[in-house]
A protein has these predicted regions:
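Short glycine-enriched loop/turn motifs at secondary-structure junctions
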Residues: 54-59, 94
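Conserved beta-strand in the GNAT
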Residues: 45-47, 101, 111-113
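Eukaryotic phosphotyrosine signaling hubs
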Residues: 1, 59-62
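Short beta->alpha transition motifs characteristic of CBS
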Residues: 2, 93-94, 113-116
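Active-site beta-strand termini and strand-to-loop segments that position acidic
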Residues: 37-42, 102-105, 115
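Core segments of cupin and vicinal oxygen chelate
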Residues: 3-44, 93
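Vicinal oxygen chelate
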Residues: 6-9, 62-109
Length: 116
């Protein structure tokens, strides 16, 4: 899993639900709420933190693999008030990869990725 501290707990969970994650488990750790979110084999641990940086740093990005990058881009731009990067291509792996990046409510970068 990938841990994500937040002082915007509800907003963060809602954001990840909207891009396909489902709540896997919820816990209380002392005075902090913890929510585990799952998308296929990827687990995010979202936990309350009163002194969060609100910028990239806790992680640089997470990548979500998709089968159709153009459909994912269309969904994100039509359903969410976000300004993603344009779909880009890199010559990684055997045939390359296409991707775009959005920014979550804590400044985290979320990459949508399609292997070609």
């Amino acid at each position: 899993h990938v841990g994500l501290p937040t002082d915007r707990y509800e907003e963060t969970i809602s954001f990840y639900h909207r891009i396909g994650f489902e709540t896997y488990d919820t816990e209380i750790n002392g005075a902090s709420r913890v929510c585990f979110l799952r998308l296929n084999d990827l687990i995010l641990e979202v936990y309350e933190c009163s002194a969060c940086t609100q910028q990239t740093g806790a992680w640089d990005h997470i990548a979500i693999n998709v089968c159709d990058i153009d459909a994912a881009f269309e969904y994100v731009t039509s359903e969410m008030p976000l300004q993603p990067t344009c779909v880009q291509k890199l010559p990684f792996f055997e045939r390359g990869v296409r991707f775009f990046v959005i920014t979550g409510p804590n400044g985290e970068r979320v990459e949508f990725n399609q292997y070609l």
